[in-house]
Amino acid sequence: RMGLATRPAGSEIPVELFELFPVLKQMLYRRGGDLSGGQQQQLAIARALASGPQLLVLDEPTEGIQPSIIKDIGRVIRMLAGRGDMAILLCEQYYDFAEELADDFLVMERGEVIASGLGSEMQSKGIRQLVSI
């Protein structure tokens, strides 16, 4: 059974979220729809982290995002992974981003696993060619 954790209305926003994504502190009183695509993605990740999950699922976090924000998101993912208190499942088509962050990888095609291994093996196993369009 999977559910979504919630925080009571009016709860304090964890300070750590602003440390992870400083731009959100500047945008605190703006509506989410008024934020850029990259800021919205950072907000979505921060909201997912607010409840202190044991598993963080990130589905294409780099989709349509400018390079500087991709670097920020990568920095946050590395920091969170380094803490070791949550598992992170990254679904990503941007090969370089995935290769840089992966401890382990799995490549699927039409619902079937066609390759898997350690992140450090991605290059030697020719994974870039498997995910090229």
Where are these regions (language model features)?
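H-loop/switch region of ABC-family ATPase nucleotide-binding domains
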Residues: 90-93
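Catalytic Walker B motif of ABC-type/P-loop ATPase nucleotide-binding domains
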Residues: 56-60
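Hydrophobic anchor residue at the start of the ABC signature
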Residues: 45
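ABC-type ATPase nucleotide-binding domains, specifically the catalytic core motifs of the NBD
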Residues: 1-12, 22-25, 117
